[in-house]
Amino acid sequence: EACAGAYKSCDKVKCCHDRRCRCNIAMDNCVCKLFYCELFGTCDRLKP
């Protein structure tokens, strides 16, 4: 049930503030999903 706790605390993780996250059972923590622009390093170009 540690996984459920990780999901609940996910909102408290800054990087998860506006994105989905998944639970990493092995590490017993919450992993934030990256935006596509983060994977390719193009986030800055998308900002107005």
From Swiss-Prot:
Location(s), subcellular: Secreted
Membrane-spanning segments: none
Coarse class of the protein's main subcellular location: secreted
Record keyword Cell membrane present: no
Tissue spec: Expressed by the venom gland.
SUPFAM superfamilies xref list: omega toxin-like
MF terms in GO: calcium channel regulator activity; ion channel inhibitor activity; toxin activity
Pfam families: Toxin_9 (PF02819)
UniProtKB keywords: Calcium channel impairing toxin, Disulfide bond, Ion channel impairing toxin, Knottin, Neurotoxin, Secreted, Toxin, Voltage-gated calcium channel impairing toxin
Keyword Cytoplasm among record annotations: no
Family: Belongs to the neurotoxin 02 (plectoxin) family.
Note on domains (UniProt): The presence of a 'disulfide through disulfide knot' structurally defines this protein as a knottin.
Protein name in the entry: Omega-agatoxin-Aa5a
